[in-house]
């Protein structure tokens, strides 16, 4: 099954401050383990919401809103796309992740036709 892992953070992701070299090394090691196990399909870190846009839909009306999106307590800061046997396997991998804050949301990717 494919799952999308959404990394959610608060203010820390909005500052654009890079992690310490030690934290970067820990993240790199963890990502290498995921790749070696054949779990990772794709991944990425997102820029702060100040650089983003939001498009809202109301019937036929489309509205573009410039970031930052300060009204949101948690923002998506990054993602992984994984191939795993089960949600439980994804949870076990996430428990090993070298993070000291934020949260992760695991969502199964629908493989239905037309999706």
Question: How does the language model describe each region?
Answer:
Residues 1-115:
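Conserved, structured core segments of small domains
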């Amino acid at each position: 099954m494919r799952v999308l892992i959404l990394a959610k953070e608060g203010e820390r992701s909005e500052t654009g401050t890079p992690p310490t070299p030690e934290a970067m090394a820990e993240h790199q090691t963890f990502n290498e383990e995921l790749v070696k196990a054949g779990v990772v399909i794709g991944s990425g870190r997102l820029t702060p919401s100040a650089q983003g846009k939001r498009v809202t839909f109301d019937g036929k009306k489309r509205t573009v809103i410039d970031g930052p999106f300060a009204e949101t307590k948690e923002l998506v800061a990054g993602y992984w796309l994984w191939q795993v046997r089960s949600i439980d396997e994804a949870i076990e991998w996430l428990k090993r992740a070298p993070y000291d804050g934020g949260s992760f949301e695991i969502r199964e990717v629908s493989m239905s036709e037309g999706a």
